Amino acid sequence: MGVAVTLGEGGTPLLPGPRLAEGLGCELWLKWEGANPTGSFKDRGMTVAVSRALEQGAPGIVCASTGNTAASAAAYAARAGLPAVIVLPAGAVARGKLAQAIAAGAELREVGGSFEEAHRIARRLAEDEGWVNVNSINPDRIEGQASAAGEIVEQLGKLPDVVALPYGGGGNTCAYVRGFEQAGAGRPRLLAVQAAERVSTFASAIRIVEPVHRERAEAAAEVVTVGEEELAEWWRAIARLEGLFCEPASAAGVAGVARVRPAGTVVCVLTGHGLKDPDAVSSHLASQDG
């Protein structure tokens, strides 16, 4: 690829989680993707997708989003000097992520209905206008996000026994499969952890009813379902025991490990920063104190 649109993404820390691991019966590591430039793992894929769009002379980029993709797409489009249109399901996007997209100058279009409806509209816009769709249906997104798996192997010095990550649309699960294949060290047991209340979960990043990559993701990973109380409990524990302030959806991996209790070396992927979703943070802390 001749053109590189980058904000310095990747190379995120892999941190031991000994206090979280107490009682779980495993050696626990935390892949801290909140350290990426816009605060989530989406940056890994967006650098590749937007670089490709710029190289191909695309007039702009478009995507549907519940938040993290919007923030990342807007930032990388601004870096590339390309316009961006973000299609959002009305009322479903966390305030922190919305602020990032607005600050970067993206055009926001709110639509009624679910993420799935926003996704259909974004695909139609891309087809009608000739813009590049940078949702995870774009293979460049998956290719970029695959880099995290190789980093884990390099940072650990070996293949972990288990990798657990949040399961929303399924694109990141597919990316990890691809990344471990590229690393050539084999594939660990993958836990794709979803919210039981997919429609209404407070973890907005995985509030997706119809995963776009369901078939591929569920063929490669073991799907684990956790409840709202489990998500909230482990989200608070990650901050209080290990000092990492992640967004609620990021706690899904740890919650899934707590439910399944795998042995060996376990890596949980914390996909985004807690500042992404201040309303969820405030409401849950307030309800706990109350």
Locate each region found by the language model.
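PLP-dependent amino-acid enzyme catalytic core
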Residues: 1-290
